[in-house]
Curated annotation (Swiss-Prot):
Cofactor: binding details: Binds 1 Mg(2+) ion per subunit.
Gene designation per UniProt: purF
Disulfide-linked positions: none
Catalysed transformations (reactions): 5-phospho-beta-D-ribosylamine + L-glutamate + diphosphate = 5-phospho-alpha-D-ribose 1-diphosphate + L-glutamine + H2O
Protein's organism: Staphylococcus aureus (strain Mu50 / ATCC 700699)
Name of the protein this chain belongs to: Amidophosphoribosyltransferase
Keyword presence, Glycosyltransferase: yes
Keywords (A to Z) from UniProt: Glutamine amidotransferase, Glycosyltransferase, Magnesium, Metal-binding, Purine biosynthesis, Transferase
Length: 494
């Protein structure tokens, strides 16, 4: 019932303005964002006369080869994208950046996140005669921009950004400027960096700035867009109807541990969440083990707080071929064992605390528990460094249906039995908020915790009817007992 699959973030975006090796630096930036998308990659370049691009399927090294990079040399400006599909199919027609050539201008555009009203916008645009060349929701905003009556591209962009809903960041390139934009809740991150020679960089995470030796300049905040051109950099607002709600899953799972989001280092946050989890749910054992890689920081925090040794009881194969993750049951059954190995000499005869970042479908953690016990572990106590993942996400994570979520239908006690653990406990929502430590004057201190609370800061829009029709009894119980701050259109409940 619950297939082997981890969570997947769908995209990473990168942009650079005014560097003689723009394409090469974009490639390096995308490489540092590879964890955000492995299904395809692309780069669009500009020299203020023309725009051209290259793209392909697979990891960055597969998608863009040396010959393609050679064709991108000599241009000063660029945007790039790594993709994991949450909207649209996996064909090359959906690999970004998209490049459009119009009679009066050319535009490259790429996007991270999910537009939750893309379906209805697309239907309206098609009724007006718009022709779409992909199934990606990114294409919607380009049609909105071109149909705008605004006098300038920037004004048309602002107008279009006010029409799309969801969690998103955009990187857009014309011959005159590099643009970046963030949704009205800042659900998805976007940062600006500056190199020593004055070159400006846009990126989904600060790790892409650091890898180029650039300095962090600022976060782009909720409802803001940035314009970078030969005159410098300008940050403006396209809407003042904003409520900061940064995705908690960026801290918990998606972002690289060396990245910083809204002033909070990801590794430090994860370690703090592990410490808080140990305070909330201690248990007697011989050692603490983390599930590689995103859970290692939390596991070290748990071990430090509880005063137990932190051991490497699981080893991850960093070089698993992508062909191992196949849509057949037989290969799925082998998936965890190929990716992870238990260290028998470490775990044999021991009582173990196993720390993981989340339980979504339950299949992966079930097989890890079995693997540890098959290797001689006496007891395995599972501790999860986030709350119960009970509600689907519509803002750019590939879990958009209740049926995929084991916590939507099973209690922690039932999940404990299903995964074969000796005990199971989760970090509380309040514990998560405290661990991350944001201090915005907003619900949940400025975090988006929709998957744990069913409270959707950007609303539901096209997803509302199906979401409500498939709510489980357990989800309905949670909603009835807990305050919600946002209505179905993302407005604050007064």
């Amino acid at each position: 019932m619950f297939n082997y699959s981890g969570l997947n973030e769908e995209c990473g975006v990168f942009g650079i303005w005014n560097h003689p090796e723009a394409a090469q630096l974009t490639y390096m930036g995308l490489h540092s964002l590879q964890h955000r998308g492995q299904e395809g990659a692309g780069i669009v370049v500009s020299d203020q006369n023309e725009l051209k691009g290259e793209r392909g399927l697979g990891l960055l090294t597969e998608a863009i080869n040396d010959d393609q990079m050679e064709r991108l040399k000599g241009y000063q400006h660029a945007i790039g994208h790594v993709r994991y599909a949450t909207s649209g199919n996996k064909g090359i027609e959906n690999i970004q950046p998209f490049l459009y050539h119009f009679y009066d201008m050319s535009v490259g555009i790429c996007h991270n996140g999910n537009l939750i009203n893309a379906k209805s916008l697309r239907q309206n645009l098609e009724k007006q005669g718009a022709i779409f060349h992909s199934s990606s929701d990114t294409e919607v905003i380009m049609h909105l921009i071109r149909r705008s009556k605004a006098p300038t591209f920037e004004e048309a962009l602002k107008e279009s950004l006010r029409k799309v809903k969801g969690g998103f960041t955009f990187a857009i390139l014309t011959k005159d400027a590099l643009y970046g934009a963030v949704d009205p809740n800042a659900i998805r991150p976007l940062v600006v960096g500056k190199m020593k020679d004055g070159t400006y960089i846009l990126a989904s995470e600060t790790c892409a700035i650091d890898v180029l030796g650039a300095e962090f300049v600022q976060d782009i905040h909720a409802g803001e867009y940035v314009v970078i051109n030969d005159k410098g950099i300008t940050v403006k607002s396209y809407t003042h109807h904003t409520t900061t709600a940064i995705s908690a899953m960026e801290y918990i799972y998606f972002a690289r541990p060396d990245s910083t989001i809204a002033g909070k280092n990801v590794h430090a946050v994860r370690k703090a969440s592990g410490k808080k989890l140990a305070q909330e749910s201690p248990v007697n054992a011989d050692m603490v083990i983390g599930v590689p890689n995103s859970s290692l920081s939390a596991a070290s925090g748990y071990a430090e707080e509880i005063g137990l040794p932190y051991e490497m009881g699981l080893v991850k194969n960093q070089y698993v071929a992508r062909t191992f993750i196949q849509p057949t049951q037989e290969l799925r059954e082998q998936g965890v064992r190929v990716k992870l190995s238990a260290v028998k000499d470490i775990v044999d005869g021991k009582n173990i605390i196993l720390v993981d970042d989340s339980i979504v479908r339950g299949t992966t953690i079930r097989r890890i528990v079995k693997m540890l016990k098959d290797s001689g572990a006496n007891k395995v106590h599972v501790r999860i460094a986030s709350p119960e993942f009970m509600f689907p996400s519509f803002y750019g994570i590939d879990v958009s249906t209740t049926a995929e979520l084991i916590s939507a239908s099973k209690s922690p006690e039932e999940i404990k039995d299903y995964i074969g653990a000796d005990s199971l406990a989760y970090l509380s929502v309040d514990g998560l908020i405290e661990s991350i430590g944001l201090d915005y004057d907003a619900p949940y201190s400025g975090l988006c915790v929709e998957s744990f609370t069913g409270d959707y800061p950007a609303g539901l829009y096209d997803y509302e009817a199906n979401y409500k029709a498939h709510l489980s009894h357990r989800q309905k119980q949670y909603i009835s007992k807990n305050k919600h701050f946002f209505d179905s259109e993302g407005n604050l409940n007064v």
